[in-house]
């Protein structure tokens, strides 16, 4: 064989080897996956509509859900994942809704799954390979572009750490407000958060009730500034419910911009949960305005001195976008595993409550 023929065969063999090479693949460490399966089932019910999934070469998986004045984000850390070729695995984003499987969250939270591969062999789509028992399925999911990952930006003017029991107490307190008006979905109930400095305390208020926490071993003030936040009570309940799934402490922060935005974060070794809440515009609500003025009078009596241990300068806050990606309207798609939804299962974020019209003060 002459030299030209040898070079031709060499190039052909190299091309065939390159074409047959497995594309960069992300997968779960199965032992870790089993450890986080139960919280993932709870997150699958909280993060459904208007949700995107981003795969990064760190590796990490970022699930982000956008609602009106609320963004919820779940990050699956590198301790749970591995990638066969980090140099050639590009960041990719898809919609949570996955034909044939119902949703990506439904796949990773299903205990029957024995293997899941996420492959990058095109910038236009993401390939899934899923096995469960004696079943094996493959699907190519189109990528979506222009989806912003919301991140905390700059220092916050407020940082308070709440232990898990305090988060549970807040959810029980919010339950009467968020559950008793389900019949009127268009009616929004508001919740106020009022922070005072001397002495440090945080108060949650609604039309029905209020609850207050002072500085203690369960509620630790690191930075504080007198402020009042006006939020949707339903958004606040969803944010705390998402953080409560991890059963760890939750950090509450307020980041300054044109107006303060509330930021909640809870984390463990494998998962991080973040919630970003924008304030609601209050109009034509005399009852709420009277209540707000009463609280503002209390705030004016507590001036923040320069050099105070609880003072923190204002920083610029990023813009929270509302991209609202298209999903299947309300219903459950064709599920590959034929798994029935059970909103009252042990994995649901459910809190019992006893209605109480009296004001509460919790000094721990």
Curated annotation (Swiss-Prot):
Chain spans, region Disordered: 1-24, 284-306, 325-364
Pfam families the record matches: Herpes_PAP
Regions annotated as coiled coil: none
GO biological process, one term: viral genome replication
Keywords, comma-separated and alphabetical: DNA replication, DNA-binding
An example molecular function term from Gene Ontology annotations: DNA binding
SUPFAM superfamilies hit by this protein: DNA clamp
Similarity field: Belongs to the herpesviridae polymerase accessory protein family.
Annotated function: Accessory subunit of the DNA polymerase that acts to increase the processivity of polymerization.
Protein name: DNA polymerase processivity factor
Originating species: Human herpesvirus 7 (strain JI) (HHV-7)
Gene name of the encoded protein: U27
């Amino acid at each position: 064989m002459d030299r030209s023929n040898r070079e031709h065969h060499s190039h052909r063999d190299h091309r065939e080897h390159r074409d047959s090479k497995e594309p960069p693949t992300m997968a779960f460490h199965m032992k870790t996956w089993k450890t986080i399966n139960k919280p993932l089932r709870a997150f699958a019910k909280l993060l459904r509509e208007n949700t995107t999934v981003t795969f990064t070469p760190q590796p990490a998986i970022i699930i982000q859900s956008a609602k009106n004045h609320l963004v919820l984000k779940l990050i699956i850390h590198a301790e749970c994942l591995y990638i066969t070729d980090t140099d050639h695995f590009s960041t990719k984003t898809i919609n949570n809704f996955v034909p044939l499987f119902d949703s990506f969250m439904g796949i990773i939270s299903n205990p029957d799954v024995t293997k899941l591969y996420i492959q990058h062999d095109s910038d236009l789509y993401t390939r899934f390979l899923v096995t469960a028992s004696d079943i094996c399925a493959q699907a190519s999911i189109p990528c979506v572009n222009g989806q912003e990952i919301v991140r905390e930006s700059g220092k916050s003017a407020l940082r308070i750490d709440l232990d898990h029991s305090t988060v549970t107490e807040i959810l029980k307190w919010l339950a009467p407000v968020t559950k008793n008006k389900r019949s009127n979905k268009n009616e929004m109930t508001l919740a106020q958060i009022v922070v005072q400095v001397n002495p440090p305390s945080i108060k949650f208020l609604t039309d029905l009730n209020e609850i207050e926490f002072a500085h203690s071993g369960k509620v630790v003030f690191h930075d504080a500034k007198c402020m009042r936040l006006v939020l949707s009570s339903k958004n606040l309940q969803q944010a705390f419910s998402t953080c409560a799934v991890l059963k760890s402490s939750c950090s509450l922060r307020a980041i300054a911009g044109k107006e303060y935005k509330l930021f909640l974060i809870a984390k463990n070794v494998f998962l991080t949960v973040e919630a970003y809440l924008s304030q609601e515009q209050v109009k034509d609500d005399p009852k709420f305005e009277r209540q707000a003025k009463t609280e503002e009078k209390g705030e004016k009596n507590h001036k923040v001195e320069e050099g105070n241990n609880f003072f923190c300068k204002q920083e610029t806050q990023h813009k929270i976008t509302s991209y609202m990606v298209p999903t299947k309207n309300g219903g459950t798609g064709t599920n590959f595993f034929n798994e029935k939804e059970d909103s009252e299962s042990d994995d649901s974020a459910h809190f019992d409550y006893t209605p109480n019209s009296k004001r509460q003060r919790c000094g721990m």
